[in-house]
């Protein structure tokens, strides 16, 4: 808690944040856009809505949510998204990157998902002069316990940071 509290500072500006479906959010010229989309993987059922149901339930105010009582983690019923297929995910990222081409972009995405790291960099590079990838080692804590000894729970979470210009952090 102390380290989190120490990270809070006053930049002297009036700041606003929005949350919601990045495809639908209406905001003019955001400085920074953070996107943590559902991950598509043909090898896993780690579908965002089904796995992160508590956060999703809160975001939906528990409206229209159907819980699968027979699952250990009480997953949600699957809801289709643009990220439900490989092509759909690539197209959705392209649309998001284009929509926010004038903003700093930070995208969180898993190494075991598709599009791949190289494909994500290529997509973001269509709209950003600079794309950096920050890999963070991560271990799934639940859901793949049958494979705990095979390292299938170990992945990298990538933070893709895209921006234009040389000194993006000092523009104001």
What are these regions (language model features)?
Residues 14, 30, 102-104, 130:
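A general structural motif
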Residues 78-128, 135:
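Conserved Class I SAM-dependent methyltransferase catalytic core
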